[in-house]
Amino acid sequence: MSIRSDEVRDKILRGARAELAQRGLAVRVEDVAATAGVSRRTVFRYFDTRDALLAAAIEDSMRSYGDHVPRPGPAADLDGWLSDALVAVHRMNAQHGRVYFELASGAARGGVLGDIARARRTARRELVQRFTDTAWRLANGTGDPPDWVKDTVAVNLSAFATEALGPDFGRHPEEVGRSLARALAHAVRGAAADAVDQGHATTPPPGAPRRRRSAK
């Protein structure tokens, strides 16, 4: 594919992403063509079907989502990293718009859109797990983080959290990210402290006599 062809394809994908954010999966090829500034025929030169176009645009969105979430550097601290990461996440949630709510609804879908919906679900689970493990490490957590911490991370990263605090409370994505970062930092630190306390409660101090098992 030539440089010119790559540019046209990228323009079509950007148009599709913008329309998906506004209209969701009900978007028409005509809408994408108008936003991209090309003809409907040009769109079909690059994508055989409407579903193939939408799937490519959503896949492009998912790839950019992961690229925008910062990874902590060697000197990173929990509060700073959570703030940067959650601001990035909620910016992306706001940009992706309506289509992500539809994909997260759990509605049965077939064909390439069904494949993309399943891929999105898998990618989200992987992101939540990676995010949880990183936050736990930065909080000096011991052992594995409890499941409720992962659940809390999932809720705080969700596009539904962006939407809940956006229109109803007039918060910008940056404000949403910073607010939820503070809440999540408290939750993760609390869980890490609980894990230490439980470890002390179950581990006898050095030199303490071991409890003998009663004879059966």
Roles of regions detected by a PLM:
Residues R91-Q95, F101-E102, V112-N140, D147-D151, ...:
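Amphipathic alpha-helical packing segments from all-alpha helical-bundle domains
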Residues A16, F47, A57-I58:
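DNA major-groove recognition helix of helix-turn-helix
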Residues M1-T35, D51-A52, R213-S214:
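Basic, helix-initiating cap at the start of DNA-binding domains
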Residues A135-A183, A191-K216:
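Hydrophobic/aromatic-rich alpha-helical bundle segments in the mid-to-C-terminal region
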Residues A21-Q22, V27, A34, A55-A85:
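Amphipathic alpha-helical linker/stalk segments
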Residues G37-F47:
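Short hydrophobic/aromatic patch on the recognition helix
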Residues E59, G80-G106, E126:
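Helical hydrophobic small-molecule/effector-binding pocket
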